[in-house]
């Protein structure tokens, strides 16, 4: 399961999606999320799915990596589907104890909710897969720049988010190493019920926290050695600049959102 968590990984490439400005990709993801949450019909969901498919093909990110990253979300998907199927009022699909509690409206809501969670996850995965942590930090800091007038530590917030994303794969790899070492000493993480499995994971926490604090201390030392003192007066080697492809991508994203809002109004 740990190896299936792919959030924070970056797949280097030279595709048009990789070459987009990080600010463009961040704004495009926001437009995508708004469009997804406004999709209320099969047609609008199909439109959002088509946009996602085009982006995946254009990015050349392995589909296997995207689907593997969805495995940790399956529990949420299953729980959401069950809650919608059995607890949404409407016309029952049949008679009896089981079918009498399942409604057509519940099935429809469950399908839409599952699609929403899956497409939302894949869209956010695609952002981190095609954008390096440094570029993501620069883009986020630039977009949040106006908040500096409110004396908010924008650079520090962006740096914290970038470091958190960067260290997710590292901590997962470290956890896997610790589990492998303890399995070699006879530890059992697979058998037993949910509570027993949770108790079996407790011995992993102490070495994992020790490793995390050690890595954090090493990172802090490395940043101090490079004379890092926050964003005040800091210059950039690569200055972000919008190009024609960025304007085209944002225009297409806005057009898709406008189309979905229009279809939501006229198509049920």
Task: Locate each region found by the language model.
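A general structural signal for short secondary-structure boundary/capping elements
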Residues: 63, 79-84, 99-102, 227, ...
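Transmembrane helix-loop junctions in multipass membrane proteins, especially transporters and channels
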Residues: 41, 45, 60-64, 88-96, ...
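Extended cationic-aromatic binding surfaces that line active-site or macromolecule-binding grooves
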Residues: 55-59, 64, 72-76, 80
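Juxtamembrane/interface alpha-helical elements of multi-pass membrane proteins
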Residues: 70-187, 194
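Membrane-helix interfacial "entry" motifs
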Residues: 14, 37, 61-65, 97, ...
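Alpha-helical transmembrane segments and their helix-start/interface "positive-inside/aromatic belt" motifs
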Residues: 25, 64-74, 249
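Transmembrane alpha-helix interface motif
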Residues: 1-44, 48-53, 57-59, 142-152, ...
């Amino acid at each position: 399961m740990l190896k299936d968590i792919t959030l924070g990984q970056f797949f280097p490439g030279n595709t048009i999606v990789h070459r987009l400005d990080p600010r463009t990709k961040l704004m495009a993801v926001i437009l995508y999320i708004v469009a997804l949450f406004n999709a209320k019909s099969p047609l609008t969901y199909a439109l959002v799915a088509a946009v996602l498919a085009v982006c995946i093909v254009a990015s050349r990110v392995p589909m296997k990596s995207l689907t593997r990253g969805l495995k940790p979300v399956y529990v949420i998907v299953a729980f959401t589907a069950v809650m919608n199927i059995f607890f949404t009022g409407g016309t029952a699909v049949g008679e009896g104890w089981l079918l009498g509690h399942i409604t057509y409206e519940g099935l429809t809501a469950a399908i839409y909710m599952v699609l929403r969670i899956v497409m939302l996850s894949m869209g956010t995965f695609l952002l981190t897969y095609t954008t390096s942590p440094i570029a993501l930090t620069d883009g986020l800091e630039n977009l949040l720049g106006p908040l500096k007038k409110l004396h908010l530590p924008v650079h520090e917030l962006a740096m914290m988010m970038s470091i958190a994303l960067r260290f997710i794969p590292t901590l997962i790899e470290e956890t896997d190493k610790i589990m492998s070492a303890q399995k070699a000493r006879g530890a059992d993480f697979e058998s037993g019920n949910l509570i027993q499995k949770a108790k079996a994971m407790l011995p992993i926490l102490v070495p994992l926290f020790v490793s995390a604090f050690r890595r954090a201390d090493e990172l802090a030392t490395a940043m101090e050695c490079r004379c890092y003192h926050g964003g005040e007066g800091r210059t950039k080697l690569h200055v972000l600049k919008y190009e024609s492809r960025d304007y085209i991508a944002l225009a297409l994203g806005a057009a898709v959102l406008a189309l979905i809002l229009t279809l939501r109004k006229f198509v049920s």
